[in-house]
Each structure stands twice: as C-alpha cells, then as structure tokens.
Amino acid sequence: VVSCADITALAARQGLFTSDQDLYTDSRMGQLNVLTGTQGEIR
C-alpha cells in the first residue's frame, strides 16, 4: 500500500511540485517585504 505522503515525497523529489513551493515561498517573502517596508532589509 502506498500512502499519499509517499506519493507526495516521490513527486516532490521529481520536481513536480517545485512551482507550488516557489509560489508559496514568493508569497511568504512578499508578506515579509510588506511587513518590513522601508524600515529594514531582510538579510
């Protein structure tokens, strides 16, 4: 029996979910940029 986690891990390893991960990362970075604004830089 193959679990959903195994399928997800395999797909992620093959790069099928890289675009989703990039979108998530970009959205997080966008939120951080909005929060910091001109007061500081993310280093």
UniProtKB/Swiss-Prot annotation:
Cofactor(s) the protein needs: Ca(2+); heme b
Q: What class of enzyme is it?
A: oxidoreductase
GO molecular function per UniProt: lactoperoxidase activity; metal ion binding
What EC number(s) is this enzyme filed under?
1.11.1.7
Record keywords: Calcium, Heme, Hydrogen peroxide, Iron, Metal-binding, Oxidoreductase, Peroxidase
Reactions listed under catalytic activity: 2 a phenolic donor + H2O2 = 2 a phenolic radical donor + 2 H2O
- Co-factor binding comment: Binds 2 calcium ions per subunit.
Protein task: Removal of H(2)O(2), oxidation of toxic reductants, biosynthesis and degradation of lignin, suberization, auxin catabolism, response to environmental stresses such as wounding, pathogen attack and oxidative stress. These functions might be dependent on each isozyme/isoform in each plant tissue.
The entry assigns this protein to a family as follows: Belongs to the peroxidase family. Classical plant (class III) peroxidase subfamily.
Query: Other remarks?
Result: On the 2D-gel the determined pI of this protein is: 9.3, its MW is: 38249 kDa.
Q: What is this protein called?
A: Peroxidase
- Organism of origin: Cynara cardunculus var. scolymus (Globe artichoke)
Q: What is the lineage of its organism?
A: Eukaryota, Viridiplantae, Streptophyta, Embryophyta, Tracheophyta
